[in-house]
Amino acid sequence: MKPLRGWQLPFLQDPCFTDLLPLLQRSLLLQGPEKLLQRLAPRPSLASETFVAFRDPQAPLGLVVSQRLNRSGSCWQIQHLRSGEASLEAGEAGRMAIEAALVRAAIQGSPNAASWIATSPGTDSTRLGLLRQQGFQQLRHETLWRWEPPQQPLDLALPADLELLPLNRRTALAMWQLEQAALPAQLRQLLDRRVDDLLDQSEQPSLMLLDTNRQQAVAGVRRLRPGHREIPELELSLHPGWQHLLGQPLQLLLEQCASGLGEVLIRSDVLQHEHNQWLQSLGMAPEGEEVVMARSVWRRHAPQTSQVVSRKLEAVLGQLQPGQKPIPTPLGR
């Protein structure tokens, strides 16, 4: 179980891996600059981390690709977990053992990560079971909706107390506060997403509806940066206290954000029945379901060595030696 090296790329010709080759090549090229720039200042992730499992260097058994989800590096995501044809000889139990070892290698290979996110199709009970064995818990069950937005966005006058604003550095704090209110508490804590992370992960146009009376974002749609899906993805956030916006105001927001796109994917929680019915009324078709899994990573801090403790003790006792500046004595009142 080793990090991917450039000389291994020619051996990743298994059909299970070939679609990942452009991503792996890019990651290898950018790993050096990524580490250097991250030491200078927190920055968005440039490159993924890849671990490869192999018995024979020319026949990889599987690989795992992971990436930072925020600038601080506190949250990481497992992007891809694949087994090759060579792992089939080990049987189903052997293949699962290989994938479990890959997940552990990814987690151990990112010592600064405090939390991990992974997703799995809702119908893949094997993958879900594997993630649970590695300490992941289900935080959200989502429906993926495929939508063909209209060529002409809805022409609608918003209520007087709502203003349509683009996401930019000036308005990002309002969008971040909206997402904090809309996300489940545990997922919000594990993602550890800051304002800069929100901007890093968004493309234009990303829009929000601002309540002008409270100066508070109450609904927003972000166009996400391209990931492993070929179809662009939109993220819809609605403040829990503003569910009445389900209708034309939110439809306007979606259509404006999806302007110029042929097809898009939109996620929603399967438990939000009213929300899902409204999405379906817009002509969206369910593409499938996905489970968001997460886990925390607790690392035991190494005890201080006796040498370090001795130096600290000497520094304290040194103040009591003759010729040293006297320690002030507090005066009683």
What are the roles of these predicted feature ranges?
Residues 1-65, 133-230:
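Amide-forming acyltransferase catalytic core, primarily the GNAT-like/NAT-type
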Residues 50-51, 75-79, 102-107, 116-117, ...:
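Short, structured motif recognition centered on aromatic/hydrophobic residues
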Residues 62, 90, 161-168, 176, ...:
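Catalytic cores of nucleotide-enabled group-transfer and carboxylate-activating enzymes in metabolic
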Residues 73-94, 228-243, 247:
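Conserved acetyl-CoA binding element of GNAT-fold acetyltransferases
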Residues 88-108, 129, 133, 242-257:
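Conserved acetyl-CoA-binding loop-helix of GNAT-fold acetyltransferases
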Residues 110-121, 259-270:
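Conserved GNAT acetyl-CoA-binding A-motif
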Residues 134-155, 261-333:
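Active-site/acyl-donor-binding loops of N-acyltransferases
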Residues 213-265:
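Intrinsically disordered, low-complexity segments enriched in Gly and acidic/Ser/Thr residues
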